[in-house]
Structures are given as C-alpha cells and as structure tokens.
Amino acid sequence: MTEFKDLAQMRRSHRKFTEQEIDADDVRLILRAALMSPTSKGQRAWQFVVVDDKQDIEKLADAKDLGSQFLKGAPLAIVVLGDPVQNDCWVEDGSIAAISMQYQAEDLGLGSCWIQMRGRGLSDGTSADTVIRGILDIPENLSVLCVLAIGHKADERKPQNEDKLKWENVHADKL
C-alpha cells in the first residue's frame, strides 16, 4: 500500500487510457472507497452508477459541449449522484466520495479524471443532468454531480512538483 503523502503527490488527471478492462475486484475496491467516505451527518445521500457499456460511455461523453470527449476512451465511468432533498451537503459529500475513488484508483495503478457535470450542459441549453438522467434512467430526486473516467493509464504524468506548491496560500490564524 502506498503512503498517502506519496499517493497525493502521484495522483494526476489522466485523459488517455488503454483498452484493457478493469478487474472487477479493483472496481469493487474503488466503490468501497466511496462508500467509506465521510458524509455530512452520516447521511450517505449519494448514489453511484457504474457504466462499462461502451455505447453508454460515449453518450455520457456527449452530455456537455466541452471537456468530456476523452471519456469515450475510458473503459469505465462512474457517475456520482446526490439527493439534494435528503442532504443539503450532497455536493460536498459527492465530491469527497469522488476524490476518494480517484485516490483508490491511483493506489491500484489506474488513472482517473473528474468530469464536472453539475451546472454544465449543451449549447442548446439542455443540462448535462437532463442528458445523463435520460441515458441512465435516473429518478428526479437525484442530481448529477460528476462522472469519473477510470482506466489503465495510456500516458505517464510526472508527480506534482513539490517546489511549485503554493504555500503562500496557507495562512495561520488570520488571512
């Protein structure tokens, strides 16, 4: 197991993947990380849809105009949903779950990239939420936060450069 300090430095967004499928045990570990993530008041107001059907992945990639076409090359997509009525912190809780999955994927040697869907859409005014809702039969009580593209890395990215950390953005006691 990788030490977290190293994992945090190594995890980068990957947008190029090989065609190799992801092992079912690895998918389960990734989802386990999400299910174990902390939530506001222990509500666990999120849902996750695991998509490995190539046609559905391609449709998800077209749910917004910009920044999602690379999803078509991923063997796996995980759609993160939340229930805004059940918990007003659904965005935060879903975000914590999503990054937990990304760190777990990195620990398994897999690449991932967050694709923002909440508040995004098509140039005709159709929201990504509406498009994804139609593809995956999502009920009205749930809202789409993001889609994670996950796969075996087709490219290598350098770890975060320690010298470029913005320590000047950290303040003690007061800004």
Where are these regions (language model features)?
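Acidic, surface-exposed loops and disordered segments
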Residues: 1-175
